[in-house]
Amino acid sequence: MTPIQFTFSSAFLLGLSGLAFHRTHLLSALLCLEGMMLSLFIALSLWSLQLSSISFSSAPMLLLAFSACEASVGLALMVATARTHGSDHLQGLNLLQC
């Protein structure tokens, strides 16, 4: 494993562990998801540059578009829950009451 691969895999695992262990606020969960998507985007970009193939060059842009959609939906959900529940604590949310 090269140092660059180790860096991006550890950044992804750090975001995953942050998502798994620090789930108090919805904003912190969204930031962990964005960190994971950013590390995947950079790793996929470097991988497509190493392969020098035309078919893999559009994959990072597609991932970036999905990441932007995920961020906008996440922020819209956070605003909606903050308006209805008064905070963004994940423990206060119950799917049966929404």
Curated annotation (Swiss-Prot):
Enzyme class: translocase
Function: Core subunit of the mitochondrial membrane respiratory chain NADH dehydrogenase (Complex I) which catalyzes electron transfer from NADH through the respiratory chain, using ubiquinone as an electron acceptor. Part of the enzyme membrane arm which is embedded in the lipid bilayer and involved in proton translocation.
Family: Belongs to the complex I subunit 4L family.
GO CC annotation, single: respiratory chain complex I
Keyword Repeat in record: no
Gene3D superfamilies: 1.10.287.3510
Pfam families on file: Oxidored_q2
GO biological process entries: ATP synthesis coupled electron transport
UniProt lineage: Eukaryota, Metazoa, Chordata, Craniata, Vertebrata
Protein name per its UniProtKB record: NADH-ubiquinone oxidoreductase chain 4L
Enzyme Commission designation: 7.1.1.2
Signal peptide (from-to): none
Domain of life from the UniProt record: Eukaryota
Membrane spanning residue stretches: 1-21, 26-46, 59-79
GO function term, MF aspect, one: NADH dehydrogenase (ubiquinone) activity
Organism (species): Tetraodon nigroviridis
Catalytic activity as recorded in UniProt: a ubiquinone + NADH + 5 H(+)(in) = a ubiquinol + NAD(+) + 4 H(+)(out)
Localization of this protein: Mitochondrion membrane
InterPro entries cross-referenced by the UniProt entry: NADH_UbQ_OxRdtase_chain4L/K, NUOK/Mnh_C1-like
Membrane-topology descriptor: Multi-pass membrane protein
Key words of the record: Electron transport, Membrane, Mitochondrion, NAD, Respiratory chain, Translocase, Transmembrane, Transmembrane helix, Transport, Ubiquinone
